[in-house]
Amino acid sequence: MILHPSLASANPLHYGRELTALDNLDFGSLHLDIEDSSFINNITFGMKTVQAVARQTPHPLSFHFMLARPQRWFNALAEIRPAWIFVHAETLDYPSETLTEIRHTGARAGLVFNPATPIDAWRYLASELDGVMVMTSEPDGQGQRFIPSMCEKIQKVRTAFPQTECWADGGITLAAAQQLAAAGAQHMVIGRALFSSSDYRATLAQFATL
């Protein structure tokens, strides 16, 4: 299992300290949720903060854009060489064009689906996608509890997009991770389960063995 710690779940007063604590740990990428309240009711990181994080961390960066116009960020992001950029299917008028713009940054391109969004209408993009991310909780600020039925959606993604890498994000505890791994998830974004633990290395090791 490839893990991606989500910095938005860390204590915002201690981001520098948290980055240092992650420096020597083994995981796929440091995950940054970019939110500006245009798509969900929250604000996370601006470009100055993203650039500061990129300067400090030795890890690759993955980005999850939870905003209405992610394309405005791509030129600036290209300078920090992102590993992955995910955008929400629900926000895109011309998804193929957006995926091409993502690749121009040097990043791998992915689509994100909220729990209520069906995936079938997007199968025509299979050859253009590197990854598909399933939101396994509602990104609504109401507790973001894991939705067990999203395991079925993970299975559908593995069938509909067999050449892409399957990600899960949202409310992932160790118990939820076991279910998601059994369903076929290859990558997991972990937030509170990691940053609320007392031993980051041990917590990552527990998840990684799934």
Swiss-Prot record:
EC number: 5.1.3.-
Keyword Cell membrane among UniProt keywords: no
Binding site for a divalent metal cation: H31, D33, H64, D169
One GO cellular component, as annotated: cytosol
Cofactor detail note: Binds 1 divalent metal cation per subunit. Active with Co(2+), Fe(2+), Mn(2+) and Zn(2+).
Keywords, alphabetical: Carbohydrate metabolism, Cobalt, Iron, Isomerase, Manganese, Metal-binding, Zinc
Keyword Metal-binding: yes
First-tier enzyme category under EC: isomerase
Pfam families the UniProt entry points to: Ribul_P_3_epim (PF00834)
Cited InterPro entries: Aldolase_TIM, Ribul_P_3_epim-like, RibuloseP-bd_barrel
Similarity comment: Belongs to the ribulose-phosphate 3-epimerase family.
NCBIfam families associated with the record: PRK08005.1
Protein's name in the database: Protein SgcE
Gene: sgcE
